[in-house]
Amino acid sequence: GLTERAVCYDIGAGTGSVAIEMALQAKHGHVYAVERRDDAVELLKKNQAAFHVENLTVVSGTAPETCRDLPAPTHVFIGGSAGNLRDILSMLLAKNPYVRIVATAVSLESIAELTACMKDFAFTEAEAVSVQIARGKKAGSYHLMAGQNPVYIFTMQSEEKP
């Protein structure tokens, strides 16, 4: 899990729910929320203010370019890569070969790319988990559970050598 002094990136941060939660967990660390969409950046800044999170820096732009001058991360969440996943992973591992990475995927293409990256980057620890939610909906006098699209959560890290 996150430590209080973690240095985190939230890449594809959207409106910042993950970044804000990371910042609350890493009380004495820092979180960099990277987002390319202007509308999401504005909402992210509003959410940061609403939750009074001071250890969070909003970075407007696309990874990996906007991350090059940031400090080396200990933990990274990738919620979106804008098609730059391999370049992002290369940049992260160059900064810290032992960084813990969590990434989500919903499309078959993203799932395939993350699965290939788990192998190609030779992570010593790698796992994929599928999570699915079902919502109840009325169908006549019955209630049926309608499955939502599954989300795949990938975790990747290489062990430090003693």
Q: Which ranges hold each PLM region?
A:
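Conserved SAM-binding loop of SAM-dependent methyltransferases across substrates and taxa
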Residues: T15-H28
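Short beta-strand element of Class I
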Residues: H28-Y32, I101
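S-adenosyl-L-methionine
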Residues: V34-P73
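Short beta->alpha hinge that forms the Motif I/post-I loop of the SAM-binding pocket
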Residues: E35-A40, G80-S81, V106
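Short SAM/SAH-binding signature in class I
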Residues: A72-G80, D87, R100
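Core SAM-dependent methyltransferase catalytic element
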Residues: G140-P162
